[in-house]
Amino acid sequence: RSCKKLLPVKQGERGLRQSDAVFHHTKQLPELMKQLFDKRYDLSAVGYSYAPRCAEGSYMPCFLVGENVAQAVSLACGADLEKTSHQVGHILAALYSCGKLDMLSSDKPFAAFHVSGGTTDLLLCEPDKAKLINITQIGGSRDLKGGQAIDRTGVRLGLSFPCGKELERLASESEHKIKPKASVDGLYCSLSGIENQCMKLIDESCSVADVAAYCIDCVCL
């Protein structure tokens, strides 16, 4: 069962300050927990994300809110507590959704591409019995992240943050596709040019649908 609620972001803003993110996590989690536990469950384990990535220095204070709730639920239910990173959670969700969880028990490494507002990483994933997955970044964006390019373009077009869903809808209405440009060096890329190109198209009065399509095509390229 899934219960979720987006954190509120003011119109025209491109995200939340960390202090505001902690506040809204703290405020909204009790309501979500009430929805989730409207009936009893026989839990064997509680999992939570302790950090954005499994990398030294990867830290965001809002993860402490989730960790505290997970620890409380674990103690109350007598369930095991399992921690991992937000990035590993995305990879596990992808494996689960495509019916490939068996890859975790294989001795063969695999590649994953994690694109979000904070990451655009090409990852070498090696199954590990203790850690589930050992992750090594082998490529990705050297500057702007894919989600940042999408959200910054969307906010400039007047969309509400996060902008991905609405930008994709606008892109589907485009009738004049603009050939995407990409700056690639081996397994790494640079996405900062996408933002500049999209802003230039907006200033030139290009249709919002065409700008949206161009932005998404560049990120997906």
Locations of regions flagged by a protein language model:
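Acidic, glycine-rich active-site loops and adjacent beta-strand->loop/helix elements
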Residues: 49-54, 85-91, 119
